[in-house]
Amino acid sequence: MRTLVRNAVAALLVFGLAGAASFAQSGEALYKSKCQMCHGEKGMADSGAGKAMKVKPVTDPEVKKMTEAQMIDAVHNGMGKMQAYKDKLSDAQIKEVVGYFRTFVK
């Protein structure tokens, strides 16, 4: 019985950690496919489209002070020239991509 419980706990830990890793990978993949064309590879808005639309980089004070909730709202409903993604991404996907984007904000 102890072996069964130990194996079950080990499986939960392994699959739980794998789930966390896939969450990060999913946010990165979504960012690359939906956001990078304007926000740039690392959020610096250094792409052609980002420069043309005058997207603010993650180093901009306005971007740096945004909370996670504000970023989620911006992706969900759009902001300035950025389109809304509420009909293109699920709430979970929006949270994942914002989580990934926030890794650039220092």
What residue ranges belong to the model's regions?
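Post-cleavage N-terminal segment of exported redox proteins
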Residues: 1-24, 74, 100-106
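A composition/secondary-structure signal for short, hydrophobic, low-basic-content segments
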Residues: 21, 32-35, 89
